[in-house]
Every structure is written in C-alpha cells, then in structure tokens.
Amino acid sequence: MTALKNDRFLRALLKQPVDVTPVWMMRQAGRYLPEYRATRAKAGDFMSLCMNPELACEVTLQPLDRYPQLDAAILFSDILTIPDAMGQGLYFETGEGPRFRKVVSSLADIEALPVPDPEQDLGYVMDAVRTIRRELNGRVPLIGFSGSPWTLATYMVEGGSSKDFRKSKAMLYDNPKAMHALLDKLAQSVTSYLNGQIHAGAQAVQIFDSWGGSLSAAAYQEFSLAYMRKIVDGLIREHDGRRVPVILFTKGGGLWLESMAEVGAEALGLDWTCDIGSARARVGERVALQGNMDPSVLYANPAAIRAEVARILAAYGKGTGHVFNLGHGITPEVDPAHAGAFFEAVHELSAQYHG
C-alpha cells in the first residue's frame, strides 16, 4: 500500500509525538457542503449515494479538497447498512429520517436474522473503502466505522429513530434474553463488518454508540459496553504493517469513561458535555481522547470559534493523545467557511502544545 504522507491522526491515537493536534470532523462529508448536495442530487437519494462506490468516494474526498488542514478521511456510509443487510428493509422518509419495513419484536425474529457477510452482503461498502484508499493515495488515513450493537438494536426494535426508546427498553427489561440474543448477533455482525473494512483498507475504525447514553449505568455496562468489548476483542489490530486503532464513542457516556477505557480501544470519543481536561486526568494514561467541541459553536463567528478551540486545547494541555473533533456531527446549516476557520484554528493554536 502507498505510504502515508500525513499520519499525525494515527500517531495521536497511539500517543506518539505529533507537530500539531490532528483534526477531523464527524459528518465532514455532509449537507453543509454545496458540493455534497450536488453529488447527492446526482445520485438521486441518500441510499443510492451510499451504494455507489464512486460517488461515495467523491463525497468522502470533497471536504479534503476544500480543507487542506483535515488529517483524516472517514468513509461515507450509514450505520444502518448492517440491519439493512440483515433484511430489515431500510428506507428514508422525508423529514422522518431512517425507517425499517420490518421490525424485530420477538426471539423468533432475532433467531431468523442472518449475520451479513461483508463482501457478499455489504460489498458496496467494501468497494467504497477500496476506491477511497486508491484515490487518497496516502494523503491522509481512512477511518472505517459502524454503529454499536445497542444503537443498531434500537433502530431495529423501534423501526426507526426514537426519542424515548420505549420498545427497546421494554424488551431490555421484559425480555433480556431476547435483547441479549439480538445484541450478540449484532456484535458478531459488527466485528465481521469492521474487519472487512480493515481488510479493504480502513486504517482506523470508530464504533458509534449514539444511544448508549440513554441507558442507566447498570444497563449501559450489560447491554452496550459488554458488546463493544466483544467487538474490540475480535477486531484485526495489525494490518499492512501498522496498528489499526479503535475509537469508542458513546454519546452521553462521560460518566463511564473509566469502564470504557478498560475495553481495549486506543481512544475514546467525548461529547461536548465532558470537560476534556478532567477526562484526561481520569483516563488519559490509558487512552487517547477525541473531541469535543459543541457542534453549535460553528454557528458563531470565526473569532468565537477560535476562542473555543483555544479553550479546549488549553484544557487538554501539553503533549499528544488528543484528536480534535466535534462532540457530535456537524449540522447541515453551518457555513462551510466556519468549518474552515475551525480547522485552521486547531492547527495554528495547537503547535505550542507539542514539541
């Protein structure tokens, strides 16, 4: 494979020295960019865009072409590709978000679910990874990703997005055997899917536990973290002569960082409700940290964005082990120039903390 021209993202995850703090942004290929909206219009709809490796590659590279400061690319896809490959029938309702034609409501439903084969059932994702790696040509590392078992389970049981997760939580408390069976099958599926992405060329992977923070502390340990540990235990950790770092991101998980740091991932993602300095004091010996600016800061003027970047860099302090990111994905209404001001500020203001 081509040598990496910029590996500071991977170096920071492995707590090796860097010249500046690396930066990338969740949803960096997304609706805030006019070039993304044009490609999506060309594709016809969101899933057609995900399922076309050439167009998925095009949108993955768009933010890198616009923002030379970006230190990583992230595969353009969706966390719900796995349930879709299990036969749940993913579709998108305008204004409603993702929906499934089939819902999971019983142990019999769960037992009937297949574990998708990455190349056979999700080949379009693997093709996208290969295409992006080829086109990147070593410019920056490529991040692969998946949803966590608990997060995927909520969509499968609810039939789509949910504000209160009532069906998922009812199953969790009423029928824990069924929920564990579903989570176990999803953990197998995610492990196989991420390993497929690593074989295809992903140089780091992130597990998005978007809804882990909706659980009680005890339920989080049993129904979310335990299954992410299974995944981390089953992942390929060396590929192409390099360590493949794993980032674990539970939105709303700031209370549980110590437990998360024991799972074996190289890094933890933080949302914006955490103080990154205290997070470093708690778990910084064991893991790198990624985050954690409030995405809404990008609605403010560039001077205010710069001030918030400076505050977070100072809170983390000197040395490596920090990948700058938002605490969740960028929102569609942000001015692209404000994202550029964010990336510039991270590189410019962080040099003093390194070397």
UniProtKB/Swiss-Prot annotation:
Function: Catalyzes the decarboxylation of four acetate groups of uroporphyrinogen-III to yield coproporphyrinogen-III.
Gene name of the record: hemE
Species whose genome carries this gene: Pseudomonas aeruginosa (strain ATCC 15692 / DSM 22644 / CIP 104116 / JCM 14847 / LMG 12228 / 1C / PRS 101 / PAO1)
Pathway listed: Porphyrin-containing compound metabolism; protoporphyrin-IX biosynthesis; coproporphyrinogen-III from 5-aminolevulinate: step 4/4
Domain of life: Bacteria
Site residues by UniProt (Transition state stabilizer): D78
Chief location category: cytoplasm
Family membership noted in the UniProt record: Belongs to the uroporphyrinogen decarboxylase family.
InterPro entries documented for this protein: UROD/MetE-like_sf, Uroporphyrinogen_deCO2ase_HemE, Uroporphyrinogen_deCOase
Entry protein name: Uroporphyrinogen decarboxylase
Catalytic activity annotation: uroporphyrinogen III + 4 H(+) = coproporphyrinogen III + 4 CO2
Binding sites annotated in the UniProt record for substrate: R27, Q28, A29, G30, R31, F46, D78, Y155, S210, H328
HAMAP family reported in the protein's UniProt record: URO_D
Gene3D superfamilies given in the database record: 3.20.20.210
Molecular function GO labels: uroporphyrinogen decarboxylase activity
Enzyme Commission number(s) from the entry: 4.1.1.37
Assembly: Homodimer.
Enzyme class: lyase
GO cellular component: cytosol
